[in-house]
């Protein structure tokens, strides 16, 4: 009913105020223009024709001029697509995109804004407001052959980005079954473990005792890094130790516990213990006294000074510690009195949904071109070159001013520009941002580690050591594979991640939740109120402003239900039960 009212109002406003712009939720005519090349990947636009896409792209100030990036040159000079680029940095992304949709002043395509375009926003801007294009009419073997084949083989990938009415308003990153279990690795500093004579903790109690021992080395230590509003704090580790399968460190997203859908922050079974653990850490100085306000720079400074022994998911220690490859390693899941099974959720980012979107501003005859561009990323080689540039042999005719990459005789990944200018870039990521990338990080495409050794340009899974059952994984910290396609940082992060692989479970709540428009609006309102309430009350419990007693916890759970948790859980349970298994 709400959607019908919205559509009626939109029609009335368009008739009365045509100068205000906005296309509304109109039927888009599917046009496959003659100038679009459907016979091969390149060029996208046939020679002799000029076509321009207006595109907003997330780029950070640390990136070089976009006109100098290899991908920009490849798209414009090889693919024959003119790009009118607007750069949007992450720190203003939310505001800029919100204003663009509110004013209906949109580009044709938006790339790299997956942290903005969650399932709820895709439904709102697409199904409700009519400001995004449903790409399903173009999802054919002729127009989008690469993604079509992926969805044919893995229909669950398509389901993960499809809304309740069968539309797809945004595409994202797909990690294959060979890789999509990659979790948010928890990191522990083994150098500090060795200083206090401890091995890797196996239980939540052992973990806290280990952090206490490290704190005793130096009272200025903050053994547990991160904060409440960052994804590298202790929250996810504790919640999973208590039995909640979740990647949300604050317990505000639906999770699975003992086979049932729960909202951890409203769950009487174990959320009280989560609060007690955080309060213990706060009272004993195991976490920062600024836990609820600390930012990334402050967290990094503590790591760089050697005063932190643990970083949660989403953190990469080498960002802060130049000796990370020697000092840090993955931490396996913990158990507790509330949960006797080591378990860890697969990454919710295995299939994302908002890295590449086409807006209603895109002309009808240009939508197919935008879809063809998006489709390129779902073929392995194209995905590879979009993210690391040209191979010196496979793209020898399209180097476009960069040196390219190759594998040396030991199959070690090498970039020619970095070899020739060893001090010009601090690390590989800086080089890629400066010379290769057009958009910020990998945001759409098919990321498939298939284990092949005969495909140049792809990682080889069998070079990783098998650490299943190894009592002390630190023995692998200095391990150098005899051959392999990983540089040191890649090897370090992937091998450390394997510490958690034996405990991965796929029995998790879906990462993308597409509800009908009415429920999407209701959930957005409920989550806003609930998130504010929970954050405030958790802060009070942890810092001692609210007594952490059984009586106060009873009041809290009553209040949290009144704030909307009960209704929210009902919606999440119904959605989960109605999913196609």
Where are these regions (language model features)?
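Positively charged n-region of N-terminal signal peptides that target proteins for export
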Residues: 1-9
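Ligand-binding "clamshell"
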Residues: 120-137, 320-343
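Conserved N-terminal structural module of periplasmic/extracytoplasmic solute-binding proteins
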Residues: 6, 20-190, 194-206, 245, ...
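Conserved small-residue motifs centered on glycine
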Residues: 39, 58, 384-536
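Helix-loop-helix "hinge/cap" segment bordering the ligand-binding cleft or interdomain interface
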Residues: 136-139, 163-236, 256-307, 311, ...
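Polar, glycine-rich mid-to-C-terminal structural blocks
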Residues: 279, 326-335, 344-361, 365-437
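Paired acidic/hydrophobic, glycine-rich loop segments that form the ligand-binding mouth/hinge
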Residues: 108-111, 309-313
């Amino acid at each position: 009913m709400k959607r019908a009212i919205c559509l009626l109002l939109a029609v009335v406003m368009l008739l009365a105020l045509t100068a205000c712009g906005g296309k509304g939720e109109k039927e888009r005519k599917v046009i496959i223009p003659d100038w679009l090349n459907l016979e091969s990947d390149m060029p996208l636009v046939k020679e002799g024709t000029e076509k321009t896409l207006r595109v907003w792209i997330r780029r950070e100030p640390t990136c070089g001029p976009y006109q100098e990036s290899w991908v920009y040159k490849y798209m414009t000079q090889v693919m024959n697509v003119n790009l009118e680029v607007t750069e949007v940095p992450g720190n203003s992304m939310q505001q800029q995109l919100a204003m663009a949709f509110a004013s209906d002043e949109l580009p044709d395509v938006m790339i790299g804004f997956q942290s903005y375009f969650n399932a709820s926003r895709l439904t709102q801007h697409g199904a409700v407001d009519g400001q995004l294009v449903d790409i399903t009419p173009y999802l054919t073997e002729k127009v989008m052959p690469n993604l079509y084949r992926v969805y044919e083989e893995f229909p669950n990938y398509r389901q993960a980005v499809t809304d309740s009415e069968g539309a797809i308003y945004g595409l994202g990153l797909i990690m294959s079954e060979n890789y999509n279990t990659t979790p948010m690795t928890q990191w522990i500093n083994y150098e500090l473990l060795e200083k206090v004579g401890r091995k890797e903790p196996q239980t939540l109690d052992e973990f806290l005792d280990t952090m206490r021992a490290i704190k005793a080395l130096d009272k200025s230590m903050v053994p547990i890094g991160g904060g409440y509003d960052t994804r590298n704090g202790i929250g996810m580790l504790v919640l999973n130790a208590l039995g909640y399968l979740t990647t949300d460190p604050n317990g505000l997203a639906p999770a699975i516990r003992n086979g049932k859908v729960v909202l951890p922050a409203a769950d009487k079974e174990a959320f009280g213990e989560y609060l007690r653990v955080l309060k213990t850490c706060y009272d004993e100085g195991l976490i920062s006294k600024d836990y609820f306000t600390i930012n990334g720079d402050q967290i990094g400074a503590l790591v760089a000074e050697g005063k932190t022994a643990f970083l949660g998911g989403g953190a990469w220690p080498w960002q802060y510690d130049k000796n990370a490859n020697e000092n840090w390693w993955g931490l396996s899941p913990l158990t507790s009195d509330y949960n006797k099974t080591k378990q860890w959720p697969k990454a919710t980012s295995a299939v994302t949904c908002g890295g590449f979107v086409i807006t209603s501003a895109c002309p009808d005859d240009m939508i197919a071109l935008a879809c063809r561009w998006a489709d390129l990323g779902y073929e392995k080689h194209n995905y590879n070159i979009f993210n690391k540039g040209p191979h010196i042999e496979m793209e020898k005719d399209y180097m476009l001013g960069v040196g390219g990459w190759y594998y040396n005789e030991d199959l070690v990944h090498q970039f020619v520009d970095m070899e020739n200018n060893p001090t010009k870039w601090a690390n590989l990521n800086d080089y890629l941002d400066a010379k290769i990338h057009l958009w910020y990080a990998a945001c759409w495409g098919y990321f498939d580690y298939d284990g092949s050794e005969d495909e140049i340009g792809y990682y080889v899974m069998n070079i990783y050591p098998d650490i299943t059952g190894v009592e002390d994984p630190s023995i692998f910290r200095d391990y150098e594979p005899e051959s392999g396609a990983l540089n040191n940082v890649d090897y370090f992060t992937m091998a450390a991640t394997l510490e958690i692989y034996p405990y991965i479970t796929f029995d998790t709540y879906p990462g993308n939740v597409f509800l009908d428009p009415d429920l999407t609006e209701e959930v957005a309102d409920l989550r806003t109120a609930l998130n504010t309430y929970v954050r405030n009350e958790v802060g009070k419990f942890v810092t001692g402003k609210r007594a952490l007693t059984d009586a106060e916890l009873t009041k809290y759970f009553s209040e949290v239900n009144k704030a909307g948790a009960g209704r929210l859980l009902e919606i999440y349970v119904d959605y989960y039960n109605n999913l196609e298994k």
